[in-house]
Amino acid sequence: QDSIRLSSRLQATLKMLHGLGEAKETTPASAARGLEVLDEVDVLQSEKTKLQQQLQNYQKEKAALEPWGDFEPESLNLLHDAGFAVNFYCCSEGSYDEAWEEIYNAMIINCVSSRIYFITVTKNEVEVDLDAEQIKLPPYSLTRVQILCQETEQALADNDQKLAVLAEKEQPSLQAALKEVNTEIE
């Protein structure tokens, strides 16, 4: 049973690596090396999945921050420590009430496709009650999220490069391991 599973994993890995490219400068085929390569590919694939999810999250955070521009979240903490609450809101143009500018010190930050993005600056103890969606922003600046996106994209490219190297060099070892496992099954 284990041999059948191993055979399936080897076949799937060979197929995936073959899709990445033809074997070129191959290392001498070794069934033992083939099993090592199988584990290396599993680790790289797992890492790739994590990186892709991480990149998706960073891209969502980036999209959430873009209408607000680039600012340091620490500056909001300084305002809070000084007794002020800064809240972020979004509403349709029709829902925005200019009276909020007087009552809550509302300031429009951006207008994007008939949506108004604005902040309120009030004393900490003042309760803000608006007919608008309150926005929770990520804990870092737009610049930081852009850097995190770039670093994650680079890590994905590095991961793909490692897989491409295995595809170039190690397919014969995987085939040798597959042959050995299939011989055990028979």
Which residues are covered by each model-predicted region?
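Long, charged N-terminal accessory/stalk domains
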Residues: 1-186
